[in-house]
């Protein structure tokens, strides 16, 4: 009988791909678990933080989503998607003023994005 081989731990890249795949398949809870492991291997990596923000948002954990998107905005104030996600998260948490402010910033940074435009119009319409 041959000794069992130990599986190599997954790399950050493999974890990110798996987590992103789970997110695309609409499994945000499983994606969040995998992406949190990935983040421990690559702390501060914007793509991982963004995917985690999306996963938490889709789970309905808007406070955690806001934390992740805020970390992205802090690291890169010109990250349009981070402002968009942060704005939507704030709105879901009942924080209208910061939500509106971040959606406006997303539109300012990327005015050609119809999703950003639509979200801002909805908020400003009341």
Annotate each PLM feature.
Residues 1-6, 100-126:
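Terminal, low-structured helical/coil segments at or just beyond the last alpha-helical repeat
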Residues 6-7, 40, 74, 108:
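Structural signature of alpha-solenoid helical repeat scaffolds
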Residues 8-41, 58:
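Alpha-helical segment of the N-proximal tetratricopeptide repeat
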Residues 12, 46-47, 80-81, 114-115:
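Helix-start (N-cap) detector for alpha-helical repeat units in TPR-like alpha-solenoids
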Residues 25-37, 59-71, 93-105:
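Structural signature of tandem alpha-helical TPR/SEL1-like repeats
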